[in-house]
């Protein structure tokens, strides 16, 4: 996908030794939904690092220290910011890979930027101007998830808010659109439309199969469709695929129905790489 922005340029965003570009080999953003413990996060990171080394796929590790938008007030939210950022910084140093986490208010921007490489704006917060500006002002790469309620062309306004800070290290993520109650669908037209901004586009395969609030006090989903949607996105052409994974998804504290079992990741990625090559051929 070679769509150019208004200035005719397709941006390449560099994060450490990883390069995001809509015409470059895809980057994997992967990890568990939330940080459950240091040992758990490091174990998942170690396995992903080994798999990606074997398959020659650039890796960014992701995990959340606080799931602030759980369906129920009783939902597990994570280990908290201070402990979570310490764990993420340790993973970055131990494996020499970029790390990503989400932020939820302007007070989290500066401390998170000191510990991680990519700050992620959750989909529900993608129009919060103060948060976007504060994130942009850190100078870190910003990954903004398109709201389930937002048209893909409206992400141009979101990108412009961050760019107004002078920060053009920006990724735009498609993660499904609301389709009635408790259901998301993926409109693959969104990928080339968002690429017209010139910024690298990410496809979030596992949240795209989420059923928000579909289990009453928790979100449901169907992980079996995530690899299928990821293959379709790579056939269109994207800079990155975002996949949440877990050693035992059915026992995960959040987003278990969507996450890919860790022991299935290598074969999943092997097939995704084939579609990436096909999508970017010629």
Curated annotation (Swiss-Prot):
Its main location: cytoplasm. Keywords: Cytoplasm, Lipopolysaccharide biosynthesis, Transferase. The gene is kdsA. One of its GO terms (biological process) is keto-3-deoxy-D-manno-octulosonic acid biosynthetic process. Its EC number is 2.5.1.55. Belongs to the KdsA family. This is 2-dehydro-3-deoxyphosphooctonate aldolase. Gene3D superfamilies: Aldolase class I. It is found in: Cytoplasm. GO terms for cellular component: cytoplasm. PANTHER family: PHOSPHO-2-DEHYDRO-3-DEOXYHEPTONATE ALDOLASE. One of its GO terms (molecular function) is 3-deoxy-8-phosphooctulonate synthase activity. It catalyses: D-arabinose 5-phosphate + phosphoenolpyruvate + H2O = 3-deoxy-alpha-D-manno-2-octulosonate-8-phosphate + phosphate. It comes from the Bacteria. The keyword Transferase applies. Pathway: Carbohydrate biosynthesis; 3-deoxy-D-manno-octulosonate biosynthesis; 3-deoxy-D-manno-octulosonate from D-ribulose 5-phosphate: step 2/3; Bacterial outer membrane biogenesis; lipopolysaccharide biosynthesis.
């Amino acid at each position: 996908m070679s769509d150019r922005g208004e200035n005719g340029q397709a941006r390449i965003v560099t994060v450490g030794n990883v390069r995001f570009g809509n015409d470059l080999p895809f980057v994997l953003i992967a990890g568990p939904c939330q940080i459950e413990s240091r040992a758990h996060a490091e174990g998942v990171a170690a396995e992903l690092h080994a798999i990606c080394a074997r398959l020659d796929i650039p890796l960014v590790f992701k995990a959340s220290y606080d799931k602030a938008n759980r369906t129920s007030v009783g939902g597990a939210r994570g280990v908290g910011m201070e402990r979570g950022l310490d764990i993420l910084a340790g993973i970055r140093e131990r494996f020499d890979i970029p790390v990503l986490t989400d932020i939820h208010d302007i007070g989290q921007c500066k401390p998170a930027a000191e510990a991680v490489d990519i700050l992620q704006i959750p989909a529900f917060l993608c129009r919060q101007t103060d948060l976007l500006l504060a994130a942009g002002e850190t100078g870190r790469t910003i990954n903004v998830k398109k709201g389930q309620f937002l048209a893909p062309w409206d992400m141009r306004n979101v990108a412009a808010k961050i760019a107004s800070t002078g920060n053009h290290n920006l990724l735009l993520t498609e993660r499904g659109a609301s389709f009635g109650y408790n259901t998301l669908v993926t409109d693959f037209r969104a990928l080339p439309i968002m690429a017209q901004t010139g910024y690298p586009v990410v496809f979030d395969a596992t949240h795209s199969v989420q059923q928000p609030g579909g289990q009453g006090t928790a979100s449901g989903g169907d992980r079996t469709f995530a690899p299928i949607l990821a293959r379709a996105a790579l056939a269109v052409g994207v800079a990155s695929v975002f996949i949440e994974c877990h050693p035992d998804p059915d026992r995960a504290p959040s987003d278990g129905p969507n996450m890919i079992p860790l022991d299935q990741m290598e074969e999943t990625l092997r097939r995704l790489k084939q579609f990436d090559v096909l999508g970017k051929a010629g």
